[in-house]
Amino acid sequence: MLDSSPRPPVVDTSRSPHVRLRPVPLDAVDLADDFWEPRRRINREVTLPSQYRHLEDTGRLDNFRRASRKIGGGYQGIYFNDSDVYKWLEAAAWTLAEGSDSELERMVDAAITEIEDAQRPDGYLNTYFTFERAAQRWTDFDLHEMYCAGHLFQAAVAHFRATGSERLLDVATRFADHICDTFGPEEGKRHAVDGHEEVEMALVELFRATGERRYLEGAQFFIDARGHGLLGRPYGQHEPSYSQDHEPLRDQSEVVGHTVRALYLYSGAADVYAETGELALLQALRRLWENMTTRRMYVSGGLGSRYEGEAFGGTSSSPTSGPTLRPAPLLPA
């Protein structure tokens, strides 16, 4: 049964059996102070519309129109451009949860229409792997297919919780069903993991929104399958640790590799623990948390001290110049 309660939480662990803190509904807090409210207003009135124009100007939305044969031409931009559309939709959805905005709603609905029309009959959706690259689907796991899917799932859950609409959620569940039909531990399914983690936590949140247990089981599979060298050398140059594929998660004790990927993985594993209560996952996450917060983190909370590979540094290695310290590593956490 779909969770359609009014103004549910951003991350809904209200029915997760192994969590102690319970989220509050979106409308339980009103940030009307002098610090946050002006920034939220700028986000609604300036930032989100500007970003939507950028999605148009850079061809990101045109990639969806091309996939549905509304326009011709070639694919525009880097292979993970779809994810930027989904990230914008997630941000716009949570903004709409604060109150109606006809212009923002128009942009959101327009983007969802292009996404709906671009989806393949089997549920697959990635505009990079359309037409000339359709035969290459699920052949190169360095190309962020599941990463993009995960951001779609999170945008869909956000849109559903913020507006009650199931339009984008229907797209997401069709794609999630395709992934769960294609990948898994069962005979005849693909045993593989994506080079860039993200889908793990997204599948759990999709499970929380829909009650469809196969999505939770899919997240468990991708966590279980990582750490067995399925990726080889990412991008032909990095060690397996770059994508946390060097050792099973339950055996890890040090945070290594690409910081954003690692935190998506750890967050997804924490989500799985919240639903299953698997002690081995919790023990591993506690070790990794201890290592990260006492040996790899800046006093500001920043992570990712190496420019090369946007990676964690060595033990207690936190230079004051040169590191990336991007905001992205903190988002999953």
Model-assigned labels for residue ranges:
Residues 1-333:
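Glycan-recognition and catalytic cores of secretory/periplasmic carbohydrate-active enzymes
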